[in-house]
Amino acid sequence: TRAFGVRLDLGVAPVFIDTTGDGDLGALAGCSFEYGESDSCPCQPMSLNALLVVKDAAALASVTHASDPSAKDNLAKDAFLAEIKRAGLFPSYSKPTLWQVRDNLMLVMMNHEYGIKPFDAAQVTEATVRARGELNKIVNALRKLGGPWEGVQIAATAEQIGVRDGRRIAGRYTVNKDDLVAGARHDDA
């Protein structure tokens, strides 16, 4: 709806609850909002992950993130980046990560899209298309390396790119750092 200039008719119901995740309803109702950290700091990057099917996940152990907060995980990310570079590419996300989901099904994160307004449908669509293109280009290049990458395929991606940082509707009160430090409680929460 955000792409079509929809206006909100407040007379339809006594209460509206915005569950869009992007603050669309609040924005349509005329509420002010912010996004990013400040005017000079854009939103966090968006990313599109993919599920990959590989021939032998065990053969990719050196590039697979173990979800362990040890230095080994950074080594796996660096090794995965080295493989992408060996294929002649450099991903938009400089810490690409590969996880084993189960058996020969892997999850990959190697794309970031920067400076995209999360409430602009055209920008989100363009970012999604670019991200899919990048994922396919990298996977195709890895496949050409052969070895453990032989036959690697994208099994699935999300419907659209993942948004980390959308609108934050301005409410009656904004929780701040001091509230968090003090463990503040609010009667209406």
Regions found by a protein language model. Name each.
Residues 2-15, 19-189:
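Flavin (FAD/FMN)-binding glycine-rich loop and adjacent Rossmann-like elements that form
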